[in-house]
Each structure stands twice: as C-alpha cells, then as structure tokens.
UniProtKB/Swiss-Prot annotation:
Protein's UniProt name: UDP-N-acetylmuramate--L-alanine ligase
NCBIfam families, per database record: murC
Binding site for ATP: G113, S114, H115, G116, K117, T118, S119
Catalytic activity: UDP-N-acetyl-alpha-D-muramate + L-alanine + ATP = UDP-N-acetyl-alpha-D-muramoyl-L-alanine + ADP + phosphate + H(+)
UniProt GO cellular component terms: cytoplasm
GO molecular function per UniProt: ATP binding; UDP-N-acetylmuramate-L-alanine ligase activity
EC top class, as a word: ligase
Main function: Cell wall formation.
Entry keyword set: ATP-binding, Cell cycle, Cell division, Cell shape, Cell wall biogenesis/degradation, Cytoplasm, Ligase, Nucleotide-binding, Peptidoglycan synthesis
GO biological process: cell division; cell wall organization; peptidoglycan biosynthetic process; regulation of cell shape
Superkingdom of this protein's organism: Bacteria
Listed Pfam families: Mur_ligase (PF01225), Mur_ligase_C (PF02875), Mur_ligase_M (PF08245)
C-alpha cells in the first residue's frame, strides 16, 4: 500500500457490510478513516461508532482532492460524492479493487460460495486469530486489522463477478448455486465465474465435495475436496449432532487429523468447519489448537442469532435463498427437536422471488407453520411483477402475510421457536413481535 497510511480514507457507503468491515480493518491498522452513508440506522454502524470512526451524511462537500475515496459497489460514478472526487482528481478506488491491492503482503484466504460465506469466514477468522496474528474481513460488518498479521481471511462475493478482482493464496469454495438472478443468467453462468476464480488462486483450493459443480473445477493449483464421502480428501466421520452442537472426527484420506466439537447447528456448519480445518491442516497449524479455538466460536451476526422472550425462542437469520432457509430450519430442529418451528420470511428482491418461487415454497414448508412479509426490494429494484401472495399460495404450511403493525398472529404459538429470515429489514417484524410478546401476559411454565 506504500506510504499512504497518513492519507484520509473516505468510504462512500460505509454502512455496507463489506465496507464497514474494511473501514474497521484500516482503522485498527492505524489508517485515518471516515465515511458517509444514508442516515438510516444499520446494524453495521455499531462497531464503527464504538471505534470512533466518523460517519457523515452523504454530501459532495465531504470530498477533498487529497483523500483516497473507497467507493461502495452499490453506488455509481454519478453519485454526488464519487462524481465530486473524480472532478477534483482525488484517487477513487472500488471496494473490491482496494482489497485486491491490500491483501498482497499476507497469506490470503478467500472464502466464497453461493451460501455459507459469512459463517465460514467468521469461523476461519476466529480459529486463525487464536493461533497466529490474523487480519480479517467478514460480511456481517466485522473487520479486524492486526498490525503484524500473517494471515488475511476475507469474504469474497461472487455478485457481479466482483471476486474476480482477487488472486488469493487459498480459496474455500462452499458451494455453487443459482442466485442473483438480476445478474447471472443461469447456473452455468455462475459456474463460469467460479471457474475463472479457480484459475486465479495461487496455492490451493478447498471445495465442498458433494457439490457437482465444484467437482468440475479445473485449476493450475491443487483442489482438495472436503465432505463425508470416501472420495473426499478431507473427511468428517463419526458425526454426532445433539442439542449442544456437533462433534466429528476428521481424516485426511485415512490419516487421523483430530476430533472436533463445534458449538453450532446444522449439517452445513459441519461442512463449513471442514473447509476451515482443511486450510489449517495444509498450512501445518497445530490441530489441537484448531480444535480448542473452534470450541469457543460464538457465531457471526445475523446467522442463527437467538434470544429467549417469555416462553418463546426468537431466532434472527440472514437466510434469503431456499438452500439457506433449509439449512437454518435444519439447525433449529437440531437444537430444539421437541419444539414447533415457526418460519417468518421476508423475500429479498423481486427477481429472486420470481426465479426461485417454487424452491422457496418447498424450503419454507420444512417449518411447522409459515408467515410471510412483503417483498423487500433492493436499491436496484423497488417494484416487480410478483406479489408476496403469489408465494403464499404455493406454501402448504400456512403462508399468511403479516405486517409490521400487526404481528399478533404469532401470539397463537406457545413454547415454540420463531425463526425470522431475510436479507432486508425483517428485523423490524422481529422487534415488533418481541415488543408485543413482552407486553403480553402468558402462562409460562
């Protein structure tokens, strides 16, 4: 990065999950950081505020020609601040291009895949940090900059092929699935992006072995597969899933690597952990230390975040794709096998809702009862040709639409688990329910 630490780094869209993480990394490494965004509150700004990073409202007057402007991917060059920076001749660099440049001095590990990126990056960062100095950037708004870091672990998003800016030493690839239908044309189009990424990895790829698309990857570096099959290089055996978490033995081919206990739920989290263990194993880290660090993992933001209110368990999860909904419900059933599971889902984007309508209905029907919230449009689309009622008609386990002003139908359930899922603002429905539940007299045994 040269001698640019004394420059002022201005983040356009600092409340974005990746942008806030990167801002924290730079701040903790001693860089001078500030940013701007809309005035609406986002959960990502809490850590920025705790760290003393200034957050300003969007205004072209925030920009000075001597600063380095890091532009969030959601904002075009015509945005008032970016346009002013270009006009003044300030250095403007996109988020993913900045990261590509920033990671060069480190042993870099990119975590990518259609699902599971954030949880896997969080676990990887937690494990590595407990063993060696590590900087990391997680998609839940968490970032950490270690002054003398050996490793840099980061989440690499496939949306609009942004991850092709990176040439990491290692990559964990969790899966390939059809998502982001506003950009990708087909599953083959998604695969082509991952195939290009595979050619850019410098040392090795760790890929989920039960994914038929990942099995087709071609690369100049070794591809190590992890999973439960005898064909996998890194295998989980003797898996035990209980209400306390999951435990399993790990083998490299027929060589015993170690016994691991993961305080997380769902088959998908075991697979995510295998990817992390594989990286640590091939980097020759102490497997006993890896197991110890894994035992203390507390999870990441908005991934099966739970609380108890009255007689109810309330879960908040970012799941916004059918595969993620299935995984979240699977985790809930593992932890609470004797409780009714109530799903409250807010679809994210009209294009995704249309493209995956039947798959959403099938996934949601794994719950005991389903409630829906109106579709959350993204910054790129505010309306579409699909209604939430269209999804509701395909769901067999309910499908009633609730509003923020009336979540009272959820009061019909007692001693159950209510799982709020979505990538939009589903948390406002959760908060409305929590408030209503707290103010309701119930017979709690």
């Amino acid at each position: 990065m040269g001698n640019q630490e004394n420059k002022l780094y201005h983040f356009v869209g600092i409340k974005g999950s990746g942008m806030s993480s990167l801002a924290l990394v730079l701040h903790q490494k001693g860089y001078n950081v500030q940013g701007s965004d809309v005035e609406e509150y986002f959960f990502t700004q809490r850590d920025l505020e705790k760290s003393g990073v200034p957050i300003l409202p969007f205004n072209a007057d925030n920009i000075d020609k001597d600063m380095i402007v890091i532009a969030g991917n959601a904002f075009p060059d015509t945005h008032e601040e970016i346009a002013r920076a270009i006009e003044l001749g300030a250095e403007v660099i996109r988020y993913h291009d900045f990261i590509a440049r920033f990671i060069e001095p480190y042993t870099s590990i990119a975590v990518t895949g259609s699902h599971g990126k954030t949880s896997t990056t969080g676990l990887l960062a937690h494990v590595l940090s407990g063993i060696n100095p590590t900087s990391y950037l997680i998609g839940d708004g968490t970032g950490h900059g270690e002054p003398d870091a050996d490793f840099f672990a980061f989440e690499a998003c496939e949306y609009r092929r942004h991850f092709l800016a990176y040439s990491p030493d290692y990559a964990i690839m969790t899966n390939i699935d059809f998502d982001h239908p506003d950009y990708y044309k087909s599953i083959e189009d998604v695969f082509s992006a991952f195939q290009t990424m595979a050619h850019q990895v410098k040392k090795g790829i760790f890929a989920y072995g039960d994914d038929k698309y990942l099995r087709q990857l071609e690369s100049e570096v070794p591809v190590y597969y992890y999973g439960v099959s005898e064909e996998d290089d890194i295998q989980a055996r003797n898996i035990q899933r209980t209400t306390e978490g999951s435990s399993f033995d790990v083998y490299h081919k027929d060589d015993f690597v170690g016994h691991f206990v993961l305080p997380a739920f769902g088959h998908h989290n075991i697979m995510n952990a295998l990817g992390v263990i594989a990286v640590a194993y091939f980097e020759k880290l102490d497997m006993q230390k890896v197991a110890e660090e894994m035992l203390s993992f507390k999870g990441v933001k908005r991934r099966f975040s739970e609380k108890k209110v009255s007689d109810m368990i309330i879960v908040d999860d970012y799941a916004h794709h059918p595969a993620e909904i299935k995984a979240t419900i699977d985790g809930a059933r593992q932890k609470y096998p004797d409780k009714e599971i109530i799903a409250v889902f807010q679809p994210h984007t009209f294009t995704r809702t249309i493209a995956l309508m039947d798959e959403f209905a099938e996934a949601l029907d794994l719950a005991d009862e389903v409630f829906l919230c109106n579709i959350f449009g993204s910054a790129r689309e505010t309306q579409g040709e699909v209604r939430i009622e269209d999804l509701g008609e395909k769901i067999q386990k309910g499908g009633q639409v609730i509003t923020e002003d009336n979540v009272s139908p959820l009061l019909d359930f007692e001693n159950a688990v209510v799982v709020f899922m979505g990538a939009g603002d589903v948390q406002k429905f959760e908060q409305a329910y929590e408030t209503l539940l707290s103010n309701t007299t119930r017979n709690v045994l």
